[in-house]
Amino acid sequence: MKKLLTLLFSLFVLSSTSVFAEWTKIYTDDEETIYLDLNTLKENLGSIYWWNLVDLKEAGPDAELSGKVYMQGDCAITRTKLLTAISYSQPMGEEELDTRTPDDPNWNFQPPDSIGGFLLDTSCKLLNASAKERERKF
């Protein structure tokens, strides 16, 4: 019985990360890879909300190798707010370093040819897409 409980606990721990986030790669270049958790795309009162994960190819100035950001977006006028930023010392959001939540975040307008514009546009398009449509895009 004790072995069974140990096995079940181990399986729970190993699978708990995927329960909370299902990261889908949406962008990559020489410096970073950006993922979106499709399960967190939500709409409320004209804004959309989502979590992104950024994996850096080289450590940043504070020794971070990855970060998660919770964003608010306005699809109509292409602007975003960063609501929470969490930095990690390991790839894929492992070993938390710091969490920052601005008291009164500002709106930032995103040019269409920027990474921020791409992320907002992608999130807006995926918000109302069916599961099959989401799979086809990635």
Feature map (PLM): residue ranges:
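N-terminal secretory-pathway/extracellular module detecting exported/lumenal segments
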Residues: 18-69, 74-138
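Sec-dependent N-terminal signal peptides
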Residues: 4-15
